[in-house]
């Protein structure tokens, strides 16, 4: 194995052993249909595509001119290291470099990562790719992701490791990562003095903008905005047309409320999950019919991005772009962004109604619930269930003409998508995953429902 690669892997292994792997994200770019057919691919793109000028927003706090489209590095391309006896998966750095170069070339200047993304390798890959460019040509965002070990010593180690991995001496946008309730916030940032440390780092110039990402209850959001005593430079919220007026799981606040509070306080909103974990890029067939009737040439993803981008207090919108065609489709939307008109907004209300009819599981595929101590592949199980449901190929009615075909596709596709030992019937209901889910999904309960559904299908010939 190449010495640099080996040292990199060993270093990140030690780091992730210390801080946990609760946000394992990445994989090899596997796309699986309801029937379980796989499609692994390398980047392909049309070289001569032309785009207009990227849309930019000015931060009212810092004056930064930020591209409305941001590159989220939660998932990056992987490759098999053929020089390794273990044939380990490693980040495909050459591919990452190409993606970042292409994005920068076309006006994207905001890049978001975390110490726990991509099995702990995202910051390093991001640093290698971006350090090849002048530092004043991009804004760099990372996070204090001290979920597993919130001690002061370990949190400080995580902070300093980020600078080393990212090859920088300052971070433009630093986030308190995924806070949603007071006790966890108190343990991770107040009791250990880390919040005071980060505020001091901002005064020293090593952090240019300090903010936080929110997953939680209304009371905690209100505390952070009105009672925390901190003047935040930005807040990252989950916002999309489905969440705008809808509350999910056991959360009690919608995106409209979050956005309007930030707008009134003149705090810029950074947007995560504009596609709801990819579900809005490929919604159910009824939703797609509504969109295609109005804009037959536009992708479903573009509708979701335009919804978020039409809101004036949005500074930037994160998108994970593992392939250059993803970047190109987004560039068509953001270069420049065309705000939604009234008829399009009305159509999206109809789309939301169809999505509520389908009763999908609200998993976004963030992988924060992983790894399961019993090996259950939680995101893959939910993805397969939702995929079959939203494709209109769900075997819930034995009297349906398509039932036998749909039943076969569901069962065969499940075995192709998820190894049998990692399926829902092996969940023991320990609940260790539940506190880590930003969507507040009652995961053991959903696993039980899916297991019962699968067993029912197996007994119905």
Regions found by a protein language model. Name each.
Residues 1-11:
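N-terminal secretory signal peptides
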Residues 11-31:
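N-terminal export leaders
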Residues 31-70, 83:
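C-terminal segment of N-terminal export signals and the immediately downstream linker at the start
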Residues 59, 71, 111, 126, ...:
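Conserved, mostly hydrophobic/aromatic
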Residues 89-103, 151-165, 217-225, 301-305:
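Short, acidic/polar
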Residues 166-184:
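Active-site groove signature of glycoside hydrolases
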